[in-house]
A protein has these predicted regions:
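Individual transmembrane alpha-helix segments
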Residues: 105-133, 210-219
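Internal/C-terminal transmembrane anchor helices
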Residues: 164, 168, 298-331
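Transmembrane alpha-helix/helix-exit interface in multi-pass inner-membrane proteins
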Residues: 167-191
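Hydrophobic alpha-helical segments
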Residues: 187-287
Length: 476
């Protein structure tokens, strides 16, 4: 039967069209008695009505997630190259009024900040509104476009966009583990009582103790991101992302990490990208018969244009990977402070009078830990452990020529919020492995204290290496 696009089909012939057919290699579909050429052509594609509805919702919802994710990562990328990010960060304030109203009147939440990338009330409410808006948009789209039988070309561009969103996220989080800056080893964890740890602190410390494990976690996420850059490897990349994000989401839920919204959305996005391959994967895993390959739609009609598009995808993706790598390496390669280490207090006096090591003494120090900076702006972190095992954390600088320690910020435990302070300490070495610190004004007191340096490798957590042969368990 020869038909042309736009031709009207007689009522007696409409039932034989069965939704779609081909004419000289071009796909057509029947819509209300008219023959309409499918967009993009070249790929067979009558979609089930539920598939069309799910795709419409996915375009709206995950498209919004992608925009939010990109806007969240852009300031990080720009800050890494020294670009002011105030105008980008101002965008969140534009959507704050409707989010605050919805949080207060619909969800019963109180928005205290426009923080994104966390489990804040702002982000939970934003996700709720995105679900509602995507549902409404899906309904309107379904009514206005009820005659369409598939979205082959739109699917190709949507998949490209979402692949890059997910790959960008994998590069960001994966590189922070492959170059261990997300969960770095912190010296003061060696002297902090285990019961004082938060669940998040337990997980962070557990991962940081084994750098190979943390690097392996990051490598898996980076591999998933690289695979997502290659169209033919989309299924492999999405599957690996789904596995990675399932583990991350489980840890976030069981250790109460404030990234539940982020990890859950990346997991859902991975499954959305994997959905077109689900039937084939199921058949390959359980039937041993993968079936025919998925026929994809090219982005452009020209083979040359598609080759250029592929090269551009790889260039942009690998370029972003390099930027994240450079940023994390810059943070990781910061110089170790001159006084890096753990120091045990042997004697402490204030106003010239010695203070006995009583657990009730709120002024006396027990230990001082000087560590590398990871989540603060200063080049050195100094932690004071008091007799009751409470901690004061400061950020500051060390002048090794003048033997001066200047503390510039008081750092809140758990949040890393910085409060400006001005405390000056002087130090000197009376003997190898011994140090003396004086201060004319610490908490309103003139103090004098002397220390013995403690080797971090003397702790069981660090002295134990790797052993292939173990005759007895070593579970302390």
């Amino acid at each position: 039967v020869r038909l042309r696009a736009g031709a009207v089909v007689k009522a007696a012939d409409r039932s034989s069209l069965r939704g779609r057919f081909y004419c000289r290699g071009t796909e057509f579909a029947s819509r209300g008695g008219s023959v309409v050429q499918e967009d993009g052509g070249g790929v067979a594609g009558w979609w089930h009505p539920l598939t069309r509805i799910g795709f419409r919702f996915g375009v709206g919802y995950f498209g919004g997630i992608g925009v939010a994710g990109v806007l969240g990562l852009v300031p990080i990328l720009l800050a890494g190259v020294g670009v002011e990010t105030g105008s980008v960060l101002h965008l969140s304030s534009l959507v704050r009024p409707p989010i605050e109203w919805t949080a207060a009147h619909v969800l019963g939440l109180r928005v205290t900040s426009a923080q994104v990338g966390s489990d804040s009330a702002f982000q939970w409410t934003g996700l709720f509104l995105l679900v509602v808006m995507s549902g409404v948009a899906t309904g309107v789209w379904s009514v206005l476009d009820r005659g369409r039988v598939g979205y082959t070309r739109l699917f190709a561009w949507t998949q490209l966009y979402l692949r890059f969103v997910l790959a960008l996220a994998m590069f960001y989080f994966g590189m922070a583990k492959a170059i261990p800056t997300q969960m770095p080893f912190v010296l003061n964890r060696l002297v902090e009582p285990y019961g004082n740890f938060s669940p998040e602190g337990v997980l962070w410390s557990q991962v940081s103790v084994s750098q190979p494990y943390e690097i392996a976690l990051g490598a898996a996420e980076l591999l998933a991101g690289v695979l997502l850059l290659v169209p033919r490897a989309t299924a492999a990349g999405a599957l690996l992302c789904a596995v990675d994000m399932t583990q991350v989401f489980l840890l976030n839920m069981t250790y109460d990490i404030r990234l539940k919204t982020v990890s859950s959305q990346f997991l859902l996005l991975s499954l959305f990208l994997l959905a077109p391959y689900a039937r084939r994967l199921f058949a390959a895993l359980f039937d041993g018969n993968p079936g025919p390959a998925i026929r994809t739609v090219p982005l452009f009609g020209s083979a040359r244009a598609n080759r250029i598009a592929l090269a551009a995808q790889l260039a942009v993706g690998l370029g972003l990977l390099g930027v994240f790598g450079a940023q994390n390496w810059q943070q990781w390669s910061k110089e170790t402070p001159d006084l890096y280490g753990i120091y045990r207090v042997d004697g402490f006096s204030s106003e010239g009078y010695a203070r006995d090591p009583l657990l009730t003494d709120e002024l006396r120090w027990r230990r001082v830990v000087i560590d590398r900076p990871f989540h603060v702006s200063d080049p050195m972190v100094l932690t004071i452990q008091h007799m009751d095992d409470s901690f004061e954390v400061y950020g500051g600088t060390i002048d090794p020529k003048r033997h001066i320690i200047d503390l510039h910020h008081r750092i809140a435990l758990g949040t890393f919020e910085e409060t400006p302070v001005r405390v000056r300490l002087t130090y000197w070495w009376p003997a190898p492995g011994r140090m003396v610190i004086d201060a004319n004004d610490y908490a309103g007191h003139r103090i004098h204290t002397f220390f013995t340096e403690v080797d971090p490798k003397s702790f069981p957590l660090l002295e134990r290496g790797f052993s292939w042969v173990q005759e007895q368990p070593y579970n302390r």
